Amino acid sequence: YITLQRSKTAREAIKTMAELVANYGYISSGESFSIADPNEVWIMELIGKGQEKGAVWVALRIPDCFVSGHANQARITTFPLAGKNKNSITSKNIDKLLKNPNIDCVYAADVISFAKNNNLYAGPDGQFSFSDVYAPVDFSGARACEIRVWAMFNQVVDGMDQYWDYATGRNINRVKPYVAGKAQTPENFPTNRMPLWVKPNEKVSVLDMMAFMRDHLEGTELDMTQDIGGGPFHCPYRPRPMGWEVDGVEYVHERATATQQTGFSFVAQCRPNTISEIGGIIWFGVDDAASTVYCPMYTCMTAIPLCFRE
């Protein structure tokens, strides 16, 4: 919220967030941020340093005409290193982010050295993977998180079948197994992860985005309306917890994009060819995204509508 108050562009937001965590620290676990303005969209992933002050992070600009997604699992893997790529900088030169429009990667200066100093990574700098070092994907990270990204990608681009076994957590390929507490090398990284972004077959609309939010894995073998848990009325809702055990066998409910415990969801629309007062719209909906009605909330609003205020 502080960043929203202080920033007018995605680049300013990244700089503000980086400076805030550097000055005041960051105690929370990892988080992924979609940061957009009318001209650019960035994805930034950030995780605290435990007992040390600050955070390690990476921010990448999503290329024009591409789409990306994240769902509670870090997704940035390797990234271009400063010094070897003129469009990449570290936090030491973060002021350049505002001055040079060609910069499309910026990261904490110690994102790799911190991992090495804390026995998290023992490989070459050029093969360092943010997600695989700081938030290694496991079964639940794939089945409950990555599968939601897969569901969206699968609706906009061909060829996503090749990532199905990965997204379901059935087959996370590694040359060598990941061992918690042991410094990783690139051989411990999955070799079949989904790309961070894909180029859609056609332009994605606001209505498409709303439809993605309503997904229950329909049309796949994990379609929540079709399995035994759906009952005779093909209900996509499942009680929590997501996992349980019977007679020594573990089972899981699917974690689709739309769930019954959602408090609110929204689709943010930035329109560069409209006056700024009404160019930004938050299509806001309360409760379950599958059945919500998305209502336009303009960025020029100074008061919350009574029906939402109550």
Residue map of PLM features:
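A conserved hydrophobic secondary-structure block that centers on an alpha-helix together
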Residues: 3-32, 38
